[in-house]
Amino acid sequence: MNSLFASTARGLEELLKTELENLGAVECQVVQGGVHFKGDTRLVYQSLMWSRLASRIMLPLGECKVYSDLDLYLGVQAINWTEMFNPGATFAVHFSGLNDTIRNSQYGAMKVKDAIVDAFTRKNLPRPNVDRDAPDIRVNVWLHKETASIALDLSGDGLHLRGYRDRAGIAPIKETLAAAIVMRSGWQPGTPLLDPMCGSGTLLIEAAMLATDRAPGLHRGRWGFSGWAQHDEAIWQEVKAEAQTRARKGLAEYSSHFYGSDSDARVIQRARTNARLAGIGELITFEVKDVAQLTNPLPKGPYGTVLSNPPYGERLDSEPALIALHSLLGRIMKNQFGGWNLSLFSASPDLLSCLQLRADKQYKAKNGPLDCVQKNYHVAESTPDSKPAMVAEDYTNRLRKNLKKFEKWARQEGIECYRLYDADLPEYNVAVDRYADWVVVQEYAPPKTIDAHKARQRLFDIIAATISVLGIAPNKLVLKTRERQKGKNQYQKLGEKGEFLEVTEYNAHLWVNLTDYLDTGLFLDHRIARRMLGQMSKGKDFLNLFSYTGSATVHAGLGGARSTTTVDMSRTYLEWAERNLRLNGLTGRAHRLIQADCLAWLREANEQFDLIFIDPPTFSNSKRMEDAFDVQRDHLALMKDLKRLLRAGGTIMFSNNKRGFRMDLDGLAKLGLKAQEITQKTLSQDFARNRQIHNCWLITAA
């Protein structure tokens, strides 16, 4: 009897143990990452040919204690290598693990290689050559603490390489994991199986091979025992011949069918090639089709299983499309696949909740470094009077109501950018802004008292409902998370896409960027204030301080301002402002852009202006500003400097976003100024529900 070890992906050990026992293995013992077992020579070859789950089959050769590199060398040399290698066999060493003595795996591999080669030269035998790429024998050494375990890797290449997939092709899951997913899916061979996001077809091919009794090792060309002196070619040929006979019989007797689809024509072509090379191409129908086009291929029965490994995203900007995808799949399953089973394998379990289905079973597994879950569902048969469940019903109804109200109003006003929803319902704490045919959903970060999983699930529901109500493509929804800035610069950089969208606001054309910054380049709540500036600016010299992207300057310029001066500390936003001006034909010396600390520039400037717009941050302690700024504390000092630049009969429009801001009217009077609050006049319909979003004042000489 041979003592053997089969390695596998984490989470599949018990499944592998059952498989090995069914092959005839005895004394199976599960450990993390694999199974120890025993079997005769035939079982060695049976496990190599038939295991769908094992990553490798190892023949342990011995162990040794390693307190020095000499210990490793002598421990390896104690094995009788000369009776293990066929004459002329090449070899390679795979060394893993480190300890205080062996601190580099390459060094460990070199010491093992030296010990093996020296075992031959000491007996005056030809030394075997190393071949790292395609060796006849692979020696595996695993060092754990002070113990080195030495084994012969009888697999050669990993057993997931079945021989049907082009090695250059990208596979999100290995074939061994795919086989486990099939086994755990609840699918019964003989019933239909469908993968609507099949990629290169791995799940379907593994299922078809399982169903037709086709050994996973049947198409492999190389093995790790070809240079092994104890290899029994006669028994191997018997095992191989039996596998070929069973495969022919299984294919001839199988009557059910497999269906695969994907939106990418190139991967579908690869899937067809892979299925043909696996010998089961005639059983699988592959189509180029998006999930949105998915239909039941057998509406009159029999019932089957939908099995898939849908895409998942680690980036925030990919989530809306994935949420929409899962939500859509859930609706299609309920509408078209009543009575079927569904099994999905995912690294993003939160996305699976978008299906709006209750899982019957779930399994955990590792896909490389990723923690994954597989959930199995049974889709209830729909009845004529059953109504589809609505996602986030209260939110959906409110958004639909707001859309009906604001869409018509925005068209009449001549604006393309407006707020559709602003935390109208406390449990759906987001803002939804429309920018032409794009939508930005800003999630207000939930308090720490709210369960993070529940908050994330609610956000997923919001996104799915928003896409559905507005009828937009998922890739035209941008998701952002907004937190209190705590004194940080509000113009935080989020990305580097550099994609700008041209939008219309009354008679102005403006550039917005929906993805790269927390804000988009256009403060929607100041829309009416900008229009007022345009109406007030004819023939006047206009100053815009803390100008951001210069949208107020554009309105003033279009309103007939004699000159405009735009000041901001950020070169990025000044360049953006210049693009906005150029888009509206506002170029030349009459339109100046100045990069400067606005407060420092204000103290030193000696020019005169008829109309000044200033919208400072509530608080700023930017390293590039000379002093920290607090709008409540410092607004009077600001007005003192502004008065010096204000021409007789001129007007300052002052706005800020501080909630509860109190204008120091007595202090203003001492400066010879008076203030008229115009906040209500500057709040448009879409911001009428949030009366504290900003406050706005007209300040003139008393």
Curated annotation (Swiss-Prot):
Keywords: Cytoplasm, Methyltransferase, RNA-binding, rRNA processing, S-adenosyl-L-methionine, Transferase
Main localization category: cytoplasm
Domain THUMP positions: 43-154
Mutagenesis / variant outcome for changing residue 568 to A: Impairs m7G2069 formation, but does not affect m2G2445 formation
Subunit structure: Monomer.
Domain notes: Consists of a N-terminal RlmL domain and a C-terminal RlmK domain, linked by a highly flexible loop.
Protein name: Ribosomal RNA large subunit methyltransferase K/L
Species per Swiss-Prot/TrEMBL record: Escherichia coli (strain K12)
Underlying gene: rlmL
